[in-house]
Swiss-Prot record:
EC annotation from Swiss-Prot or TrEMBL: 4.2.1.33
Organism, scientific name: Rhodospirillum rubrum (strain ATCC 11170 / ATH 1.1.1 / DSM 467 / LMG 4362 / NCIMB 8255 / S1)
Requisite cofactors: [4Fe-4S] cluster
Function: Catalyzes the isomerization between 2-isopropylmalate and 3-isopropylmalate, via the formation of 2-isopropylmaleate.
Pathway: Amino-acid biosynthesis; L-leucine biosynthesis; L-leucine from 3-methyl-2-oxobutanoate: step 2/4
Gene3D superfamilies, sorted: Aconitase, domain 3
InterPro entries: 3-IsopropMal_deHydase_lsu, Acnase/IPM_dHydase_lsu_aba_1/3, Acoase/IPM_deHydtase_lsu_aba, Aconitase_4Fe-4S_BS, Aconitase_4Fe-4S_dom, IPM_dehydratase_rel_enz, IPMI_cat
Domain of life of the organism encoding this protein: Bacteria
Record's subunit section: Heterodimer of LeuC and LeuD.
Keywords: 4Fe-4S, Amino-acid biosynthesis, Branched-chain amino acid biosynthesis, Iron, Iron-sulfur, Leucine biosynthesis, Lyase, Metal-binding
GO biological process: L-leucine biosynthetic process
Protein name (Swiss-Prot/TrEMBL): 3-isopropylmalate dehydratase large subunit
Length: 472
């Protein structure tokens, strides 16, 4: 019997092609997701060297960052964005890579499309030229973002040079309170470990609270692993995983499905395996969370207050808090529930799935968006949009005063028409609150879909549990 292994090490070792003297490893890549922003130079590199895409059938492309979420019949107004999307179309056609075009109902955010199509599978190595590739770790896949030069390397060789990571376990036991979601879990974890806490590690999430999450919830948790500084996030696959994947287009079928299930059931950390770092948290202690500053680690319970830099002993941290509060235009000690907002964004690869929209619609039903707030709902894919519309969720949002959009990355980042104006404050279900992330001078508060809707209704950051019963 060999040494007990962690889930990460099982996947890593099964994909090793070669190990160099300095410890650098060549690993095989099972799946490669491609989008329009980080791929043009990679395809050009192949063209210049006369190379082909080695495994086009293990590659899937979709445009998401630059696509408009309003009337698509008018095309893409911004020239640079249009060129990038057109280049993805021509490059994938030239190199034989499957591409979900903008008018394809399967189009959407790459990290929502991959799982939806069954392209994401347990035990696989998955890469994409995008930091939030960690999302796919929810399936027990080793998934991480890569740079443009690495995109070219994977296209050409289906392999990648990497140094092995350390192992971190984040165990969250106990039951979640009513109104607390997967988004609150991961924000609380980042608040605990900081944005550098996971540096050099792959984080495995485990415990009763994690096992109790749906696949959508697990994807939300793994999505923001990168905001905790980690290389990737992992959750061991189980019956919830298998049920989600069954029958999806790229998932195994028939005897191959049964064989896959048998293998996937081995993808769990062995008893006695040792982690480099272990973090334990009580799910029952987690409240709805909200960020107050310009880093995902600047997070407090929604029932809390804006921190006072004077209470921080470390000069560097004190200065960082002061700078963040100046940018966010917040006063120390101010209750977070008194912070007024201008915009609400529900969507992104963190919270743009059908479960997120159902949770949001349940709170929006029978209520109205405040007159001072502009609120938009952006489904994560065409299939999510179709499902939501079949359930009447779009009508609930529209009647409440939300805008109902086409799928895309939208206001998560200022690379398309959906942006904040300088000084505008947004309650956002996305994953980053850096200065200017949603538009130059824009101020971002990261929240769950429930908090986002409640905030849209009251015009200030609000816990959905505190709302009066709706009339709907």
């Amino acid at each position: 019997m060999g040494k007990p292994k962690t889930l990460f090490n099982k996947i890593w070792q099964s994909h090793l092609v070669d190990v160099q003297d300095d410890g650098t490893c060549l690993i095989y890549i099972d799946r490669h997701l491609v989008h329009e922003v980080t791929s043009p130079q990679a395809f050009e590199g192949l063209r210049m060297t006369g190379r082909k895409v080695r495994r086009p059938e293990q590659t899937l492309a979709v445009a998401d960052h630059n696509v408009p979420t309003t009337d698509r019949s008018k095309g893409i107004a911004d020239e640079e964005s249009r060129i990038q999307v057109e280049a993805l179309g021509s490059n994938t056609a030239e190199f034989g890579v499957p591409y979900l075009e903008m008018d394809d109902i399967r189009q959407g955010i790459v990290h929502i499309v991959g799982p939806e199509q069954g392209f994401t599978l347990p035990g696989a190595t998955i890469v994409c030229g995008d930091s939030h590739t960690s999302t796919h770790g929810a399936f027990g896949a080793l998934a991480f973002g890569i740079g443009t030069s690495e995109v070219e390397h994977v296209l050409a060789t289906q392999t990648l040079l990497q140094k092995p990571a350390k192992d971190m376990l984040v165990r969250i036991d106990g039951a979640l309170r009513p109104g607390v979601s997967a988004k609150d879990i991961v924000l609380a974890v980042i608040g605990r470990i900081g944005t550098a806490g996971g540096t050099g590690h792959v984080i495995e999430f485990a415990g009763e609270a994690i096992r109790g999450l749906s696949m959508e919830g697990r994807m939300t948790v793994c999505n923001m692993t990168i905001e905790g500084g980690a290389r990737a996030g992992l959750i061991a696959p189980d019956e919830v995983t298998f049920e989600y994947l069954k029958g999806r287009p790229f998932a195994p079928k028939g005897a191959a499905w049964e064989a896959a299930i048998s293998y996937w059931k081995t993808l769990k950390t062995d008893e006695g395996a040792v982690y480099d770092t272990v973090i334990e948290m009580d799910a029952g202690a987690i409240e709805p969370q909200v960020t107050w500053g310009t880093s995902p680690e600047n997070v407090v319970a929604l029932s809390g207050r804006v921190p006072d830099p004077a209470a921080e002993a470390d000069p560097g941290r004190r200065a960082a808090i002061e700078r963040a509060l100046a940018y966010m235009d917040l006063k120390p000690g101010m209750p977070m529930t008194e912070v007024a907002i201008d915009k609400v964004f529900i969507g992104s690869c963190t919270n743009g799935r059908i479960e997120d929209l159902r949770a949001a619609a349940a709170i929006a039903k029978g209520r109205k968006v405040a007159a001072t707030v502009n609120a938009i709902v952006v489904p994560g894919s065409g299939l999510v949009k179709e499902q939501a519309e079949s359930e009447g969720l779009d009508q609930i949002f529209l009647e409440a005063g939300f805008e109902w959009r086409e799928p895309g990355c939208s206001m998560c980042l200022a690379m398309n028409a959906d942006k904040l104006a300088p000084g505008e404050r947004c309650a956002s279900t996305s994953n980053r609150n850096f200065e200017g992330r949603q538009g130059k001078g824009g101020r971002t508060h990261l929240v769950s879909p429930a908090v986002a809707v409640a905030s849209a209704i009251t015009g200030k950051l609000t816990d959905a549990q505190s709302l009066a019963p709706s009339l709907g």
